[in-house]
Every structure is written in C-alpha cells, then in structure tokens.
Design a protein with these regions (language model features):
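Specificity-determining recognition surfaces
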Residues: 97-129
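Sequence-specific dsDNA recognition surfaces
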Residues: 1-2, 15-48
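A short beta-sheet element
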Residues: 13-14, 37-99
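Extended boundary segments
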Residues: 1-13, 120, 130
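Short, well-ordered beta-strand elements within core beta-sheets of diverse protein domains
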Residues: 32-35, 80-84, 125-131
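Short proline/glycine-enriched turn/loop segments at secondary-structure junctions
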Residues: 2, 69-70, 115-119
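Amphipathic alpha-helical segments
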Residues: 90, 94, 123-153
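A generic secondary-structure signal for well-formed alpha-helical elements
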Residues: 53, 101-102, 147-152
Length: 153
C-alpha cells in the first residue's frame, strides 16, 4: 500500500520509463523494499525497461534504458525488465532503436486490448531487434546523442 512509498530506496516509476528514452540520472521516488526485492528487481547498466500495460495501445511498450547502475533501486510492477545477456548490445543504441516507429509497430501486432492494453512475456521474446556491428551501434548512438544535446540546449 501507500504506506511503503515516500521513504526508503530509489524506485523506478512507470512515468520514468514512459517519459524517458534513458533513465533519469536520479530516481526521485522512494519505496520501502527488502534485500531480496532489491536483489531480484535490481537496475544495472544496460537494463531495458518496457511498459507492459497501458490505457491505450499506442502507449504500450514504451522503453527506457539504464546507462548506469542504480544501487539499491527497484522498478514498478507495470514495467518489464530485459537484461541483455550479450556484449553485442550498446545501451545508447538500443535506447534509440526501441523508440523507432519500425520497432514500436511490433507492439501493435502482439498486444491485446481488453480494458487495458498488455503484452505477454512470450510476445516480447518473439520481437526482432536489429543489431548492427558494435562500431555501427556506437556511431548511430553518438550522432543521435549529439542531436539530443542540441535540442535540449
């Protein structure tokens, strides 16, 4: 319940994921969590978070990528964590790629709509991700990061 929120350890909210291609530098929300929860729901550099439920289909599957470790932090239950098990994924590249219309279109094909849009775990596992060689991923991410910096400043 609500009594667990407001104090404790950093907490990744649904809106943190929904509104940011990359996790914010600081997670402002706090929640009381156990050692076990902090271990099983940890946030490490390279982790990809995807919103798995939403009010509408077009808001489903929004992603955000952790560019650093967040010690003692946990994430919300309406978000799915994907932890790449390969060194073939450059976090900045995947952060941009997962927000492209081409990739996001796959969510529409897999999602189901009852009263809320939702994604099943198996659907996420069946989605295709284009991974060019690491050097190309770095170049793409660097170019897009520079544009982001120009837009923000």
């Amino acid at each position: 319940g609500r009594q667990f929120f407001g104090t404790g350890f950093p907490f990744l909210t649904f809106s943190n994921v929904f509104n940011n291609w990359f996790l914010p530098k600081q997670l402002e929300s706090l929640v009381q969590t156990t050692d076990k929860e902090r271990e099983s729901c940890s946030i490490k550099a390279g982790d990809v978070f995807i919103t798995r439920t939403s009010e509408t289909m077009d808001e489903l599957g929004m992603s955000s990528v952790a560019l650093r470790d967040y010690p003692n932090a946990t994430y919300n239950g309406f978000t799915k964590r994907l932890r790449p098990i390969t060194d073939r994924v450059y976090p900045r590249y995947i952060g941009y790629y997962l927000r492209t219309p081409k990739f996001r279109g796959q969510f529409m094909a897999f999602s189901t709509m009852t009263t809320r849009a939702s994604l099943a775990n198996n659907d996420l596992l069946n989605m295709e991700v284009e991974l060019p060689p690491m050097e190309i991923q770095h170049r793409i991410a660097t170019i897009l990061s520079r544009y982001d910096s120009l837009i923000e400043n």
